[in-house]
């Protein structure tokens, strides 16, 4: 009998996390920050915990002009950011043009959900994100999605806290 654990090195490409850019902040004359709609500390804890590198891509607006950016999360914690300098030389994403901008971290593996927890109370009360399963039938080129779990509601978080 062979026992194994399906982690980053065997099924790492099975995980992806998508974020929406909710705002842009000009820190100084050189630093343009894109703020995501979640927290790196709760959604992808290995980013700040062990400086894990992931494939980062823009999901849309590939035909737009790009600029160097820094990525920050929603919390007030000084560690809630994606350090482009330790993960790659620089991060370049499409310039914001008033429409939505989505980004994806790919090959996140099996551990981020276990480390961040699902359905419990997250750092700074950031709700657990919606989870979807993307699949396709063998021999079919179409992808199908189904909802695995809705985004965590404030009611469920308050219930866990005893309110």
State where each predicted segment sits.
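Charged (often Lys/Glu-rich) extended helix/loop segments that serve as interaction or gating elements
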Residues: 1-163
